[in-house]
Amino acid sequence: MTRSQKEKMLAGEMYNAADPEIQAELLLTGAWLKRYNDTLGDSAERWNGLLLERLGAVGLGAVIRPPFHCDYGFNIRIGAWVYINYNCVILDVAAVTIGDGTAIGPAVQIYTADHPHDPEQRQAGLQLGRPVSIGRHAWIGGGAIILPGVTIGDHAVIGAGSVVTRDVPAGSTAMGNPARVKAGGRLPKS
């Protein structure tokens, strides 16, 4: 049996992004995002109700401040008491998991979308995704970019503006471009 392009995408395999089923999902998400982003002045309860319509999972007390942008939504799972500030972009062609109590600053970008290195495959419209996982009680500073395939451990801190290209261990602090784990692991207590 031949698998659909959407099934290939969800399995992390190479898929054709121009496939009609995938394009239809993007249109559905675009319409949902318009509704969601039009609620800027509304309550967190209203936001939560809309999030439950499209996201894969939404924990108790989770907040995503509009405007928010994603590819599909159904690949995003956010835990309880997660806070995501304005202008977050999540390219969720693969799973994005955000653990309980995590705080994400404004304009953070989380990418699961990747492309083949072979130019002929790219020209043919082929793509693939690699999942991103952010642990519990992590803090992602504003403007950080998290690249495909990265895992950020529980209680980790990512400095503002950092570009995270590799895994960050639990309890550590990483910053810079590319992000590097700081010696001593944690920011000093103030």
UniProtKB/Swiss-Prot annotation:
Record's protein name: Nodulation protein L
Organism expressing this protein natively: Rhizobium leguminosarum bv. viciae
Gene3D superfamilies in UniProt: Hexapeptide repeat proteins
GO cellular component: cytosol
Parts forming coiled coils: none
Single GO MF descriptor: acetyltransferase activity
Record lineage: Bacteria, Pseudomonadati, Pseudomonadota, Alphaproteobacteria, Hyphomicrobiales
Cross-referenced InterPro entries: Hexapep, Hexapep_transf_CS, Hexapeptide_acetyltransf, Mac_dom, Trimer_LpxA-like_sf
Entry function: Acetyltransferase implicated in the O-acetylation of Nod factors.
